[in-house]
């Protein structure tokens, strides 16, 4: 769960192979399921990265080097920042009406390690807007991931998405007023757009600890992006458990706070 809201979460185990067939009404009942042997590991990690002011840029090549501060906001974990292909982002500020759905299409190039979608910055904090991602790379679109908690900050990351067409749906589940304004973001990461190289090593990161890393951003130029898309430099936060590594989150280096407006 990327960017979970604060509070209590409940985790349920089901013996179905396809979560689309999971009986959510049954899961809401108070009766416990029969005892079943299982092993469940849950890790809550929150880290943020900030770019220090002293960055050097090469205007001729579209590259820049940044010194980064990384802060661990939660419990102890072992991890590091990792290099990541440059992202190609679509940022928009949109208006959504009650019970309306807005659909966005994304073309994922071959070899993309991640596809990310996010809805945030709602004009009404009581509005409930949900996010759905569909894999349309085959003959029919299939549900891939959903973020549908009661709050309006929804985020989904698809690791190693199949190449081809994907669709993202933003759904106005419940709006106190007739409309709500929100910020929309989707990002495809691929080496054809450029690369963000990072120097860091896996270490134990204590609670509230900070560490430094250096990142070098290289961009293939504006011509590598489709119209309406811009470069999205970000690094990968990687966790370690024994000798096994796993992706935790994608952390943006530079935030663009001037999204385009659409009605």
Predicted regions and their residues:
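Long, low-complexity ectodomains and other extracytoplasmic segments of secretory-pathway proteins
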Residues: 21-79, 189-196, 240-263
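Short, solvent-exposed loop/turn segments enriched in Ser/Thr/Gly
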Residues: 7-9, 209-212, 220-234
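Non-cytosolic beta-sheet module surface loops
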Residues: 3, 15, 108-110, 119-124, ...
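Solvent-exposed, conformationally flexible loop/turn segments
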Residues: 45-74, 89, 97-99, 151, ...
């Amino acid at each position: 769960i990327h960017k979970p809201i604060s509070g209590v979460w409940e985790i349920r185990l089901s013996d179905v192979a396809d979560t689309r067939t999971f009986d959510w009404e049954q899961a809401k009942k108070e009766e416990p399921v029969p005892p079943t042997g299982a092993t469940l590991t849950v890790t809550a990690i929150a880290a943020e990265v900030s770019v220090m002011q002293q960055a050097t840029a090469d205007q001729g090549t579209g590259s820049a080097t940044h010194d980064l501060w990384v802060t661990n906001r939660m419990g102890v974990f072992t991890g590091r920042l990792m290099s990541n292909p440059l992202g190609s982002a679509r940022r928009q500020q949109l208006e959504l009406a009650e019970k309306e759905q807005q659909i966005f299409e994304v073309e994922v190039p071959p070899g993309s390690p991640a596809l990310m979608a996010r809805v945030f910055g709602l004009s009404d904090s009581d509005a409930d807007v949900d996010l759905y991602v569909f894999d349309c790379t085959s003959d029919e679109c299939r549900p891939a991931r959903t973020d549908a908690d009661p709050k309006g900050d929804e985020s989904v990351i698809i690791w190693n998405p199949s190449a081809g067409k994907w669709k993202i749906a933003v759904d106005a589940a419940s709006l106190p007023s007739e409309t709500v304004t929100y910020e929309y973001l989707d990002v495809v990461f691929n080496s054809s757009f450029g690369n963000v190289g990072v120097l860091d090593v896996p270490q134990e990161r204590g609670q509230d600890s900070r560490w430094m890393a250096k990142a070098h951003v290289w961009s293939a130029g504006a011509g590598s992006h489709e119209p309406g898309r811009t470069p999205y430099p970000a690094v990968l936060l990687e966790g370690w458990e024994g000798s096994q590594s796993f992706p935790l989150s994608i952390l943006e280096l530079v935030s663009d706070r001037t999204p385009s407006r659409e009605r």
